Amino acid sequence: MGNVRAYIYFGALLSFVNHKLGVTMSNWLSDSIMVKKGEANGKQNSSHSITEDSQGKYHYVLGAYAEPVLTVDPGALISVETHDAFEGKIEKETDKPSEILNVPYLNPQNGPIFVNGARKGDTLAVYIKSMKPRGEQPVGTTCLISEFGGLVGTKDTAMLNDPLPEIVKKVVVDEKGVHWSKNLILPYQPFIGTIGTSPEIEAITSLQPDYYGGNMDVPDVAVGNVIYLPVNKDGAYLYLGDCHAAQGDGELCGVAIEHPTVTEIQVDLIKNWEIANPRVESEKFFMSIGSGRPMEDAVRRAYRDLVFWMEKDWGYDKLEAYF
């Protein structure tokens, strides 16, 4: 499943975007869609936590059939203890993913979180306040998995060449960086790989991205940014997990620097603001995320949403926005 994010950062909206530049995070957030339209207007009204113990069972599908682990009002600040994508099962570099992992039981999700007042046609706003690695080092895990990734044949697209060997790399991850080797420390740039609301009636694997969010693996779903998710079911049923310490655009080999975290989010609710697919707002950009196959369809979905967004919310002529 391809993912594309499209940005609004060009002439038509440059003056609006520049209004955000050079200001502190707190100031830009006060000018955000979440604060302007949200029921809580960016104000924190309660604090909660979801630990491994309180979560209990992690979920491998996004759906409305699991009992909510937490019920909150808009404005709630929530600290969440997430697992890595493998639920901690890969412990050492001699481990073989093919022997340890039980596909499709990957990408364990915290939640669901029930948000009071959320109804179909509303939008859930999630501000990602902070992310920190947790657990005993080395907490970072990445690997090559046979027949998995963007430059290899898969079981569905088999080639004559032999599959790549299985390789596991464990790395120390702290707030100073990803300690890849003695000579290389990568920046610590954490983001939420999988986040979404429940579809209306389906329960869909957490490995899949679509209109409700899911396994998008978009690096902009990061600390300091707000992701907007469509509400398809009363209560929204928010899930999140699969946090990454570092990743390029695309997760080409199929696996990022996976790590468990303590992730702090603040949720708000925007009534009667209906969106077709996830959107992200940062200090500099408005973004739309399109998911689909082939990748061309993901591109069309993302840019189409931007065009309609500009037309509906900022008053641009549709064809002018298309330019």
What does each model-found stretch correspond to?
Residues G38, S47-L101:
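N-terminal, Lys/Arg-enriched amphipathic/low-complexity engagement segments
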Residues D53-G63, V103-Q109, I204-Y212:
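Short, structured beta-strand/loop micro-motifs enriched in basic residues and often containing a Trp
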Residues V72, V115-A118, V221:
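Short, well-ordered loop/turn sites that connect or cap secondary structure elements
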Residues A85-D95, M131-T142, G235-A245:
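Short, Lys/Arg- and Gly-enriched loop/turn segments at beta-strand edges
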Residues S130-V223:
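Intrinsically disordered, low-complexity linker/loop segments enriched in Gly/Pro
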Residues I192, S198-N215, P219-D220, N225-E296:
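Conserved mixed alpha/beta catalytic, RNA-binding, or beta-rich assembly cores of soluble enzyme
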